[in-house]
């Protein structure tokens, strides 16, 4: 792998920091805003860093940035906490009931917010691909029962958990996919059981 320029190191360090803080990468626009450059300039930096073997990008996805190698400025070991991977969420059972837990995975302590309960769900389907969430990813969830409009949440509808963008309307909840082939779900019976705070992906 080739050495990075100072600006490329700074861009890679910014991407690494954002992923550590919120679990998913910044958009090209966010990178441009951080460094005072155009989206085209940010894209050119990403492609140059990719050619040097530090990350991978995917076409037509604003957040599809996958780190392969850390920036030399970000080589400090990361402390981790184990959280449960929840299988099918059964109505009437606590989320952390033994019957629901498939396994445990480590997440960085920066993502684990003190004593706030956290869990993980395996993503199935392609309804959130436009925000870089793919089938097979493990969604890192902060357990909570309230949400703000525009947040990505886990909502329980009858006996099924779904990962969608939350909007509270006057007399119902609207849950939106981030894939145009899926229509919004409008319901009065959805229960919020968590908010997305990160993604765990195995390569």
Swiss-Prot record:
GO biological process: DNA repair; DNA replication; negative regulation of DNA-templated transcription; proteolysis; SOS response
Name the UniProt record assigns to this protein: LexA repressor
GO molecular function: DNA binding; serine-type endopeptidase activity
EC number per UniProt: 3.4.21.88
Function per UniProt: Represses a number of genes involved in the response to DNA damage (SOS response), including recA and lexA. In the presence of single-stranded DNA, RecA interacts with LexA causing an autocatalytic cleavage which disrupts the DNA-binding part of LexA, leading to derepression of the SOS regulon and eventually DNA repair.
Quaternary data: Homodimer.
CDD domains: S24_LexA-like (cd06529)
PANTHER family assigned: LEXA REPRESSOR, LEXA REPRESSOR-RELATED
Organism: Leptospira borgpetersenii serovar Hardjo-bovis (strain JB197)
Similarity comment: family membership: Belongs to the peptidase S24 family.
């Amino acid at each position: 792998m080739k050495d990075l320029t100072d600006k490329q190191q700074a861009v890679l360090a910014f991407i690494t920091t954002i992923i550590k803080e919120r679990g998913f990468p910044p958009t090209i626009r966010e990178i441009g805003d951080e460094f005072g450059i155009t989206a085209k300039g940010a894209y050119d930096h990403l492609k140059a860093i990719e050619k040097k073997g530090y990350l991978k990008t995917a076409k037509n996805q604003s957040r599809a940035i996958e780190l392969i190698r850390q920036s030399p400025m970000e080589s400090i070991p990361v402390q981790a906490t184990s959280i449960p991977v929840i299988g099918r969420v059964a109505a009437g059972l606590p989320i952390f009931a033994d019957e629901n837990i498939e396994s445990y995975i480590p997440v960085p302590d920066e993502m684990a917010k003190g004593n706030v309960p956290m869990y993980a769900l395996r993503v199935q389907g392609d309804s959130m691909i436009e925000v870089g969430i793919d089938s097979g990813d493990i969604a890192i969830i902060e357990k909570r029962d309230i949400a703000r409009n525009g947040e990505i949440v886990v909502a329980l509808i009858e006996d099924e958990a779904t990962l969608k963008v939350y909007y509270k309307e006057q007399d119902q909840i609207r849950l939106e996919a981030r894939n145009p082939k899926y229509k919004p779900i409008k319901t009065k019976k959805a229960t919020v059981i968590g908010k997305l705070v990160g993604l765990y992906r195995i390569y």
